[in-house]
């Protein structure tokens, strides 16, 4: 179990000969929803030996990791009595947490954030934390519906297309409104963990986010200190991407749209995002940490984690943690739970997702063949080739 031949090593996957985080974003040719690819992904979730046997073909790393046979019952959750008399302070303020999601649409960011909340709630180390997701897309839809009383209007020109790079200012406005809502509710003690759910796909957007975090933490009027955690969600399995695009065609933007129109519009939207996307890297992590330390004038906490292909690909050499010398128990406990969630995601949740993808493609032979034909006509080899070209034009292949 866990072995594969060279002939199927990239079947249905995006290439992943790892030198840096950027190399994750590279497409290869192959069956978009090959049964062999999905079966292999299923086995990968079940087989801990897979990660050691395939380091060179997935993510090259010399750091081994123990995978528990029972990831839902991990040692850190046992025999622990929470010490509520030991709060952690930074700059004289009680700490709260902000998780910044990064990732292209249709990679699973929202699903993974809901799984993370479930994990935090089920662990005695963190079950007292109040968690809330702040989704920029939902804020956009709320504002749009309040303004025009309609779902998303599909555009015919680049000037009307919200997701066209020419209209970045509009997207940035919605993101800033969402971010300010997160700060407001954190400051009013309405939640303890705020998850900023947006693509956050450019260096400029991320720079703005952390400038705002610094401003919040150094503002004398703010009641709490935010500990930033970066969670990048990536997907380079063609079957997963295709399945996710199918599901996106049923979200709130497309409730009143025909299936084919929804698929075409979302595929176009995805190309726009690929044309601007810059993966978060360790260099950017270090730059942000230096920036925060300089502006907050203290050695501050900063953490970076990755979930790749529903957790099947091991991101060991990408993850990064910085604990200041004065880091308290609350931060260490919370990060330990999150890190454990990341390390065991494929076994805790990924297997179920991969099985759903397999069932989706297998079931078309018995039911909605027209739907699959429509999906194939849009999300095909040419579509993935176009995405690859966009990646290469950005210098991230």
From Swiss-Prot:
Catalytic activity: beta-D-fructose 6-phosphate + ATP = beta-D-fructose 2,6-bisphosphate + ADP + H(+)
InterPro entries, alphabetized: 6Pfruct_kin, 6Phosfructo_kin, P-loop_NTPase, Pfk27
Gene Ontology terms for molecular function: 6-phosphofructo-2-kinase activity; ATP binding; fructose-2,6-bisphosphate 2-phosphatase activity
The enzyme's E.C. designation: 2.7.1.105
Protein's GO biological process: fructose 2,6-bisphosphate metabolic process; fructose metabolic process; regulation of glycolytic process
Position of the Glycyl lysine isopeptide (Lys-Gly) (interchain with G-Cter in ubiquitin) cross-link: 55
Induction field: By glucose and fructose, but not by galactose or maltose.
Signal peptide (UniProt feature, chain positions): none
Residues at which ATP binds: 103-110
CC annotations in GO: cytoplasm; cytosol
Binding site for beta-D-fructose 6-phosphate: 269
Region named 6-phosphofructo-2-kinase: 85-305
Entry annotation: catalytic residues: 197, 235
Transmembrane segments: none
Keywords: ATP-binding, Isopeptide bond, Kinase, Nucleotide-binding, Transferase, Ubl conjugation
Disulfide bonds: none
Enzyme class per UniProt: transferase
Role according to the record: Synthesis of fructose 2,6-bisphosphate.
PANTHER family reported in the protein's UniProt record: 6-PHOSPHOFRUCTO-2-KINASE 2, 6-PHOSPHOFRUCTO-2-KINASE/FRUCTOSE-2,6-BISPHOSPHATASE
The protein, known as: 6-phosphofructo-2-kinase 2
Source organism per UniProt: Saccharomyces cerevisiae (strain ATCC 204508 / S288c)
């Amino acid at each position: 179990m866990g072995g594969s031949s060279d002939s199927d090593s990239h079947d249905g996957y995006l290439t992943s000969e790892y030198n840096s985080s950027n190399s994750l974003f590279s497409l290869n040719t192959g069956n978009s929803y090959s049964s062999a690819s999905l079966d292999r992904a299923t086995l990968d979730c079940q087989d801990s030996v897979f990660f050691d046997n395939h380091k060179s073909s997935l993510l090259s790393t010399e750091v081994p990791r123990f995978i528990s046979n029972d990831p839902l019952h991990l040692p850190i959750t046992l025999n622990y009595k929470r010490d509520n008399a030991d709060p952690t302070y930074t700059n004289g303020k009680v700490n709260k947490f902000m998780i910044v999601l990064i990732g292209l649409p249709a990679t699973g960011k929202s699903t993974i954030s809901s799984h993370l909340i479930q994990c935090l709630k089920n662990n005695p180390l963190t079950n007292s934390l109040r968690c809330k997701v702040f989704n920029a897309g939902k804020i956009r839809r709320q504002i749009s519906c309040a303004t025009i009383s309609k779902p998303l209007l599909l555009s015919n020109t680049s000037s009307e297309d919200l997701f066209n790079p020419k209209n970045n200012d509009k997207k940035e406005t919605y993101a800033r409104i969402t971010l300010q809502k997160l700060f407001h509710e954190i400051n009013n003690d309405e939640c303890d963990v705020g998850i900023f759910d947006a693509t956050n796909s450019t260096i400029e957007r991320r720079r703005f986010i952390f400038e705002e975090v610094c401003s919040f933490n150094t503002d004398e009027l703010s009641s709490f200190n935010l500990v930033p955690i970066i969670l990048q969600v990536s997907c380079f399995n063609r079957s997963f991407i295709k399945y996710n695009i199918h599901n996106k065609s049923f979200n709130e933007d497309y409730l009143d749209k025909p299936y084919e129109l929804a698929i075409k519009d979302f595929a176009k939207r995805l190309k726009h995002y690929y044309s601007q996307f810059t993966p978060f890297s360790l260099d950017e992590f270090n730059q942000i940490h230096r920036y925060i330390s300089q502006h907050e004038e203290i050695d501050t906490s900063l953490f970076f984690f990755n979930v790749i292909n529903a957790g099947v690909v091991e991101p060991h050499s990408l993850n990064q943690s910085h604990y200041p010398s004065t880091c308290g128990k609350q931060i260490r406990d919370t990060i330990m739970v999150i890190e454990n969630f990341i390390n065991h995601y494929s076994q805790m949740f990924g297997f179920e997702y991969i099985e759903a993808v397999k069932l989706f493609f297998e079931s078309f032979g018995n039911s909605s063949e027209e739907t699959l034909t429509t999906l194939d006509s849009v999300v095909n080899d040419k579509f993935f080739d176009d995405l690859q070209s966009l990646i290469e034009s950005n210098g991230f292949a």
